[in-house]
Amino acid sequence: MAVTVEEFKEQLNHSIINADVVKIFDNLLTIAVESDASDVHIEAFEDYCRMRLRMDGELVELVQYPKSLHESIISKFKIESGQMRPDERRLPQDARVSTMTLTNKEIDLRASTL
């Protein structure tokens, strides 16, 4: 039986509660691919952070999470890119990478930090 996008969202929320950055990363990419999202936006605000997906031209909020997890999540993306420096927070960085999702789909992604 295939796992649905809703089940991956539940897993993402569970990963956030447990502060499991590896699972947050894996579930976020899988949800994005399975939802046919063109973009993933990870945004920090003063009191919280959020993840949004661009689907059919619209940004849709996926989840909010505590600001205490933000640096770890961004660092995970930078490390997985293999081309970004996790310790660089002042300058924008770009990378391209091919990876596999939890559903064994190969994806090509471009990551940018601002």
Q: Model-found features: residue ranges?
A:
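N-terminal "pre-motor" subdomain/linker immediately upstream of P-loop NTPase catalytic cores
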Residues: 2-114
